[in-house]
Amino acid sequence: MSETIIAKKAQIVDTVVEKFNNAVSIVVMDYRGLTVEQVTELRKQLREAGVQMEVVKNTYLRRAADKAGYEGLDDTFTGPTAVAFSNEDVVAPAKIIANFSKSADALEIKGGMIEGKVATLDEINALATLPSRDGLLSMLLSVLQAPVRNVAYAVKAVADSKDEPAA
């Protein structure tokens, strides 16, 4: 094998290692059976959420996972494999892919990684049911606001009762 081909392969592996290291979550999927239109739509939805979808040879993925120090992903790198990398939102790739797989039965989630730890299929599916980061923050905010709101209503009720003339 020529030196240039080996260098190109090493560069691809290094690029994938960098994506592994920068990602907060990764979802590995089997896209066999999807039409071009379906893959294009999936890529579009992922891109809108800031998630990159890559189709890389399984050999390169195995080498990159080993080089990045992620053991346990090798079993997911079989057959036609696509990988979704998210650098910001942990929930986004799992949620988008799980929702998309409801309409495209051929799409199959194989596994992934969540914040540096290898995740099983069940963990990825559980993650997909969670609200997004913004949704979780709004829930937290409403929980924090509830006691303050109740105190404000109580103070207003007391003030209103003092304003009413005695009967």
Swiss-Prot record:
A GO CC term attached to the entry: large ribosomal subunit
GO molecular function: large ribosomal subunit rRNA binding; structural constituent of ribosome
Swiss-Prot/TrEMBL GO biological process terms: translation
Pfam family, one: Ribosomal_L10
Keyword tags: Ribonucleoprotein, Ribosomal protein, RNA-binding, rRNA-binding
Source organism, top-level taxon: Bacteria
Family as reported in the entry's similarity comment: Belongs to the universal ribosomal protein uL10 family.
Assembly information from the UniProt record: Part of the ribosomal stalk of the 50S ribosomal subunit. The N-terminus interacts with L11 and the large rRNA to form the base of the stalk. The C-terminus forms an elongated spine to which L12 dimers bind in a sequential fashion forming a multimeric L10(L12)X complex.
NCBIfam families in the cross-refs: PRK00099.1-1
Record's function text: Forms part of the ribosomal stalk, playing a central role in the interaction of the ribosome with GTP-bound translation factors.
Name assigned to this protein: Large ribosomal subunit protein uL10
Organism: Latilactobacillus sakei subsp. sakei (strain 23K) (Lactobacillus sakei subsp. sakei)
